[in-house]
From Swiss-Prot:
Gene3D superfamilies xrefs: P-loop containing nucleotide triphosphate hydrolases
Binding-site residues for ATP, renumbered to this chain: G17, P18, T19, A20, S21, G22, K23, G24, T25
Source superkingdom: Bacteria
GO cellular component terms, semicolon-separated: cytosol
Main location: cytoplasm
Organism of derivation: Burkholderia vietnamiensis (strain G4 / LMG 22486)
EC number: 2.7.4.25
Compartment list: Cytoplasm
Reactions that this protein is recorded to catalyse: CMP + ATP = CDP + ADP; dCMP + ATP = dCDP + ADP
Record's protein name: Cytidylate kinase
Amino acid sequence: MKSTRPFHPTPVITIDGPTASGKGTVAALVAAHLGFHLLDSGALYRLAALASVRYGIDAQDIDALVKLIDDLHITFREGCAQLDGVDVSNDIRAEAVGNRASAIAVHGPVRVALVARQRAFRKTPGLVADGRDMGTVIFPDAVLKVFLTASAEARAARRHKQLMQKGFSANIENLLRDLRERDARDSNRAAAPLKPAADAKLLDTSALSVDQAVDQVLQWYRALGQPA
C-alpha cells in the first residue's frame, strides 16, 4: 500500500537509529545509489562537540555553545567533515567526542541552533538524512522513514571494528557499556528522545549485511512509487 504522505518536489529519506546500528553506512550507500545529497546529522553534533572541547567551552554552558554553533564554519566535502577548513573526519569519531556530543544534545537551545543547518541540506534531487531524530523532528514530511535497530552486542562489535580500522584502541566491554549508557541517555532525554517515528519502517540489522539493509531501504522507496 502506497504512502498517503503529500508529495514533496525534493524527497527526503530519513534513516534513524542508535549508535553503531549501521545507519551511516546504509544512508551513504542509499544516497550514492539514488544520486541524492547526504546529511550525517551526527557529524554536525560531533563537529560542534569537538569545537567545544578545542575552544574550552563547558558542556553545560548553553549560551556559549549556541554562539559557537552559530559561528562554526562546517563543510562536508568528498566524504570528509571539515571544521574551519580542516578535515576532522577521524577526530570526530573518537569515543570521547561522541560522548560530548550526546551530552550537549540534551540542551534544547543547542538542538535549535543546529536544526536550520540540517534542514538546509534538503536540495534537489533529494536527500538521505541519517541521525536520531531525522524522521520525528527534522524532516517529519520525509517520503520514507527508516529506523534501524540492532542488538547492543552487535553494535559494540561493529563499533570496535570501526575504531580499530581507524587506528584507535578500544575495549569491546567498555564500548558495550558506553553504548548502553548512551542508549539510555538518548532515549530518556526531554528534547527529541531517540525513538522511531510513528510511520517509520523498522529494520533490525543485527544479522543483515550492509548490502541487504541497503536493498531493503531501496525496495521500500520503490514501493512508494519513487524511481530507484
